[in-house]
C-alpha cells in the first residue's frame, strides 16, 4: 500500500477514536437515567440472582417468550447493578453500545473496506443525539444491545450460509436460532425478518436464481422461527402461563392508520441526525448559548476524518455494489423496527397526544440510519462519482457543521430537560444515591424526609425510600415524601423531620433538619450538609436575619461537608454555586 494511503487511514482512525472518546467522556455521568434503571438497581441491591432470573422469566412468559438465556443475561445485569459500583453502572450502559458499533463497523469494513468501517463509527459518534425519550443511549441498553448483537450476528451467519457449500445448512440453523434469541429480548426484533428478505433477494439475484420458490427455500428456517414466535405469543395471550400484568396486552390493541404513520415517523426518525432541531426550545437554546470550544474542536476533528475518507477512498465497483445492499438493509431496518409498536393504540397515544418524540425502538432505528448514511456516503467515491477536488472539502464541512449542531442539540436537551429520561434525571438519581450513602440522614435520626426535587420512580418514592434506608452505613426506617401538601400536613406528627433539596445549578444536595414550617417554607435551626455526586469547589450562601452568610467548600465525588448553623434559616434561601 502506498505510504500516503496508509497515513490517511491512520488519520481517519485517529479522528474516529478522538470523536468516540469525546462522546463517551461527555456521557461519563449518564447512567441510572430512567425509572426502570433505578428500580432494577434497587432490586439488584436487595435481591439475589435467583429472584432476578425468576422475575425476568415471568416477564418473558407473560409475553410468549420461551427461553432461558435472556433471563440469565438479565440476572447477570442485576448482579452487576447490585454491586453498587459507579463503573459497573457506566460499563453496563456503554460497553454494549460500543460492542454493536464495533460489530457494525467490522461487518462493513469486511465487506467494503476498513475505511468504510471506520467511517461508520465516526458518523455514529458525530451525529448522536442523546434525547430524553427512553433512548437506549441513556436507558437500560444491555438487554436491547444484546438483542441487536444477536440479530447482527445472525444476519452475518445467514450471508455466510449462502457462501459456504460445506457448512451452509448449519450456519443457517444457527442464524435462525440467533434470530429467535434476539426476539426473546424484544418483540420488535421480529421485524429483522425484513432485512433477511432483502439479503436473500440480493443473493439470489446476484446468482441469477431469483424466484419465489428459491426465496422460500432460502428463508425457510427463519420463516418457521418467526411463525413459531408469533404462534407462541398468540397462544399465551389466550392461555396465560403466568398471571398477566399491566402493559402485556398493549401490543394487541391496534390504533388507526393516520396515527400509525405519525407514530412510525416519530419512533423511526426521532434520532435521525439533527432531528431534534424540530423542537423550538432546542433551536432557541442553541442560538442563546452558542457552542463551547471543545465542541468546535471535536466537530473539526470529525470533519477532518470525513475529509480524509473522501480524499483517499478509491473507486471499487464490487465494494460499491455491497454498500448498496448494506445501505438498503440499514434503511429497511430503521423503518421497520418500530413497526409493531407504531401499530398499537397505546404508543400512538404517546406520540399524538403526549408529543413523545421517540421510544426504545428509536435507538435501534438510529443504528439503521447510520448504516444507511455511511453506505450512501461511501457509495459516492466507491462508484467513482466524486471525481472533483471539491468533494472532500464539501463533505468535511458538512460533517463539521452537522456534528457541531449535534453538540448544540445535546447541550440544549440537557438544559431544557426535554423528555422523561434526560441526563438531568441521571444527575439527580446519582446525587440521591450519594446522599443515601453519606448516611447523614440516618445519623441525624430523621424519621421523615421531605425531598420535593426528586421525582421518584413512575411518580412513586418507594424505590428512593428503599435506597435511603438501605444504602446508609446503618440501615434504618424512614418515610420519604416529595409532595409539598403531604409533607406540610404530615410533618407535625413526626418527631425529627428533615429535608433533602436539590440545587440544580451546582448539582448538589442540601440536607438539614426541618425544625419549623413557616408560610409554606421549611426552616432549619440546625447544621447544613452539602453533598456532591461528582465533586468540585462550591460557594454556599444563605440568609440569617437579613445577613448573607457565605462559605467556600471543596468536595470529592460522593463526599459531603457539614456547615455549622444555629440560626433560623429558610431552606429556600440556601444557594450553592459551583466555582
Feature locations, PLM:
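Intrinsically disordered, polar/acidic, low-complexity terminal segments
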Residues: 3-117, 211, 219, 236-324, ...
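Juxtamembrane "helix-exit" motif on the non-cytosolic side of transmembrane helices
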Residues: 28, 77-81, 127-137, 205, ...
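Membrane-interface micro-motifs in multi-pass membrane enzymes
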Residues: 67, 116-160, 184-189, 334-376
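Transmembrane alpha-helices and membrane-interface helical segments
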Residues: 102-106, 153-160, 196-201, 226, ...
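Membrane-interface transmembrane helices that cradle and orient dolichyl/undecaprenyl
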Residues: 151-171, 206
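Membrane-interface alpha helices of multi-pass inner-membrane proteins
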Residues: 169-187, 192-193
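Perimembrane helix-loop-helix junctions
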Residues: 191-227, 231, 235
Amino acid at each position: 500500500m502506498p505510504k500516503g494511503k496508509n497515513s490517511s487511514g491512520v488519520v481517519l482512525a485517529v479522528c474516529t477514536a478522538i470523536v468516540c472518546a469525546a462522546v463517551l467522556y461527555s456521557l461519563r455521568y449518564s447512567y441510572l437515567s430512567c425509572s426502570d434503571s433505578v428500580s432494577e438497581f434497587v432490586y439488584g441491591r436487595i435481591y439475589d440472582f435467583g429472584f432476578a432470573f425468576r422475575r425476568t422469566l415471568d416477564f418473558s412468559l407473560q409475553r410468549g417468550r420461551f427461553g432461558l438465556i435472556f433471563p440469565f443475561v438479565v440476572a447477570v445485569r442485576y448482579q452487576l447493578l447490585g454491586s453498587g459500583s459507579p463503573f459497573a453502572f457506566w460499563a453496563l450502559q456503554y460497553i454494549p453500545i460500543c460492542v454493536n458499533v464495533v460489530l457494525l463497523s467490522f461487518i462493513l469494513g469486511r465487506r467494503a473496506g476498513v475505511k468504510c468501517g471506520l467511517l461508520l463509527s465516526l458518523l455514529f459518534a458525530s451525529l448522536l443525539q442523546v434525547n430524553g425519550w427512553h433512548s437506549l443511549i441513556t436507558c437500560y441498553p444491555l438487554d436491547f444491545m444484546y438483542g441487536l448483537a444477536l440479530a447482527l450476528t445472525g444476519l452475518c451467519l445467514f450471508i455466510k450460509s449462502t457462501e459456504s457449500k460445506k457448512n451452509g445448512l448449519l450456519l443457517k440453523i444457527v442464524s435462525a436460532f440467533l434470530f429467535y434469541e434476539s426476539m426473546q429480548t424484544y418483540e420488535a426484533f421480529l421485524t429483522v425478518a425484513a432485512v433477511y428478505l432483502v439479503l436473500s433477494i440480493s443473493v439470489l439475484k446476484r446468482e441469477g436464481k431469483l424466484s419465489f420458490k428459491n426465496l422460500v427455500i432460502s428463508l425457510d428456517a427463519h420463516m418457521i422461527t418467526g411463525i413459531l414466535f408469533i404462534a407462541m405469543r398468540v397462544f399465551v395471550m389466550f392461555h396465560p402461563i403466568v398471571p398477566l400484568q399491566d402493559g402485556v396486552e398493549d401490543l394487541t390493541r391496534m390504533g388507526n392508520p393516520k396515527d400509525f404513520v405519525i407514530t412510525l415517523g416519530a419512533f423511526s426518525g426521532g434520532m435521525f441526525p439533527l432531528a431534534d432541531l424540530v423542537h423550538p426550545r432546542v433551536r432557541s437554546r442553541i442560538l442563546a448559548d452558542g457552542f463551547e470550544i471543545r465542541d468546535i474542536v471535536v466537530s473539526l476533528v470529525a470533519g477532518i476524518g470525513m475529509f480524509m475518507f473522501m480524499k483517499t477512498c478509491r473507486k471499487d465497483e464490487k465494494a460499491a455494489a455491497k454498500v448498496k445492499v448494506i445501505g438498503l438493509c440499514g434503511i429497511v431496518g430503521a423503518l421497520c423496527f418500530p413497526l409493531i409498536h407504531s401499530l398499537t393504540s397505546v404508543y400512538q397515544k404517546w406520540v399524538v397526544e403526549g408529543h413523545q418524540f421517540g421510544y426504545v425502538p428509536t435507538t435501534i432505528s438510529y443504528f439503521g440510519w447510520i448504516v444507511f448514511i455511511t453506505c450512501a456516503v461511501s457509495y459516492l467515491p466507491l462508484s467513482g462519482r466524486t471525481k472533483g477536488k471539491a468533494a472532500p472539502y464539501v463533505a468535511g464541512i458538512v460533517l463539521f457543521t452537522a456534528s457541531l449542531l449535534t453538540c448544540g442539540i445535546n447541550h440544549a436537551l440537557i438544559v431544557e430537560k426535554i423528555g422523561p429520561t434526560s441526563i438531568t434525571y441521571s444527575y439527580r438519581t446519582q446525587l440521591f444515591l450519594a446522599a443515601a450513602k453519606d448516611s447523614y440522614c440516618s445519623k441525624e435520626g430523621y424519621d421523615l424526609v421531605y425531598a420535593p426535587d426528586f421525582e421518584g420512580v413512575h411518580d412513586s418514592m418507594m424505590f428512593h425510600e428503599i435506597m435511603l434506608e438501605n444504602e446508609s452505613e446503618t440501615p434504618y426506617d424512614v418515610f420519604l415524601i416529595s409532595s409539598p401538601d403531604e409533607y406540610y400536613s404530615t410533618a407535625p406528627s413526626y418527631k425529627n423531620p428533615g429535608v433533602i433539596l436539590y440545587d440544580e445549578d451546582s448539582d448538589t444536595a442540601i440536607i438539614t433538619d426541618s425544625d419549623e414550617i413557616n408560610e409554606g417554607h421549611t426552616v432549619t435551626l440546625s447544621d447544613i450538609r452539602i453533598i456532591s455526586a461528582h465533586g468540585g469547589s462550591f460557594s454556599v450562601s444563605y440568609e440569617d436575619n437579613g445577613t448573607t452568610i457565605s462559605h467556600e467548600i471543596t468536595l470529592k465525588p460522593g463526599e459531603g461537608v457539614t456547615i455549622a448553623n444555629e440560626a433560623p434559616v429558610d431552606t429556600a434561601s440556601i444557594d450553592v454555586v459551583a466555582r
